[in-house]
Amino acid sequence: GATGAPGIAGAPGFPGARGPSGPQGPSGAPGPKGVQGPPGPQGPRGLTGPIGPPGPAGAPGDKGEAGPSGPPGPTGARGSAGPPGATGFPGAAGRGETGPAGPAGPPGPAGAR
């Protein structure tokens, strides 16, 4: 005789086994910047620097006091003789003693005849 109608479909099968994990996705965008932390402690003191160059010369000092007087100098050479003095006044008149008698005079002239 003729072929019969198809039978009723069977029930669905069981789910298959879980597939393998997919590849890792790309990294996400960077997050926002965090808040700035507090300042750190002060570092240790640095080494002492080298000695600086000498300063400029000072201003000149005040003038000193005058020294004591020196010893007396040697005696100078003798000067030349001065001019002659003025003529003196006339002396007083002399008071001579009376001189001795003079010699006898010559003979007189002859007498008259």
UniProtKB/Swiss-Prot annotation:
| Cellular component GO terms, alphabetical | collagen trimer; extracellular matrix; extracellular space
Write out the biased-composition intervals (Pro residues).
103-113
Carries keyword Secreted? yes
- Which residues are reported to carry the modification 5-hydroxylysine? K33
InterPro entries per record: Collagen, Collagen_superfamily
- The highest taxon in the source lineage is Eukaryota
| Residues modified as 4-hydroxyproline | P6, P12, P15, P30, P39, P54, P60, P72, P84, P90, P107
Q: Name one Pfam family in it.
A: Collagen
Family per similarity comment: Belongs to the fibrillar collagen family.
Q: How does it assemble?
A: Trimers of one alpha 2(I) and two alpha 1(I) chains.
Q: What is this protein called?
A: Collagen alpha-1(I) chain
Q: Which organism is it from?
A: Brachylophosaurus canadensis
